[in-house]
């Protein structure tokens, strides 16, 4: 988009395929689908986040009940924080909150790693990474056609849909803050580093829990997590030092995780709705931040987690098709850029040869 003077929106990904027609009905339709996918993707995240925040608050202060009313109030509070960040802008609000978020996340992960079974975690990290890479193709295409299980719908398809719903806003937001970077830098900073961090995160927390169950006999952790998945992390912290402090930090971290997602998502939705304009009125950015909270609250009251999951999958399906087309557009754009670089190099060589001949 920046290189060719195009708007920073999803429609620009189709420019190598359909050219100026991205400014017509096709481009409008693509951006609308991206807006809906992002809106419901963030709303789903908020719905899941408040369930865990509510569980954490109940764990720290039992007088606070686990109830829809508390979760709706939590949605309002978190949305207010996101609204403040959006109004503050990219440099003052979003950037500072993102730095705080990463500091808390890394600190929490290092704490669990150091006080937990460190050697076991490192061994499991290497083994699980190898197992993941070995099984990724088979697991990706496994739809359990010959068995009957709710797992595939509640987890695999939901996570795929959730990821796809997040794709437009994450991609566009990272593109917005990565202007001037090379493709190599972009791939390294956006794909490689976060992937390694994700592997480490799941290994540290997941394998610490497995070590407690397998090696230290805390089998009750299994039934406690099965009874309420939202308190899984807090039940894990019961077996670690500084339980109350770590649990409080975790609640704060969950809040900042969502707020950073909501504020950046609001900026991207606002940009999409404005045709790729980077600077928009404050009230317009605030509108999208508030709407995300309203959608999350309505879906949570109407149908709980199942309603959130259903809307995520429904909105992600059409965008999955757009993503495939966008990948073809990216491939064609790189091919064109490659030919352009070769032509430029050839022109420079010819010019240099001509200058030497004249000399």
Each predicted region: which residue ranges?
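Hydrophobic, membrane-embedded alpha-helices of multi-pass small-molecule transporters
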Residues: 1-2, 38-46, 70-78, 82-85, ...
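Transmembrane-helix bundle segments that line or gate the permeation/cavity pathway
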Residues: 1-59, 84, 113-116, 120-123
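Flexible loop linkers connecting adjacent transmembrane helices
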Residues: 2-25, 92, 212-238, 265-277, ...
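Helix-loop-helix connectors at the membrane interface of multi-pass transporters/channels
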Residues: 7-25, 49-73, 105-108, 172-181, ...
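Loop-to-transmembrane helix boundary motifs in multi-pass membrane proteins
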Residues: 19-28, 66-83, 87, 156-165, ...
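Membrane-interface loop-to-helix entry segments
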Residues: 30-34, 38, 44, 54, ...
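Hydrophobic alpha-helical segments and their helix-loop junctions in multi-pass secondary transporters
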Residues: 43-61, 73, 106-143, 205-210, ...
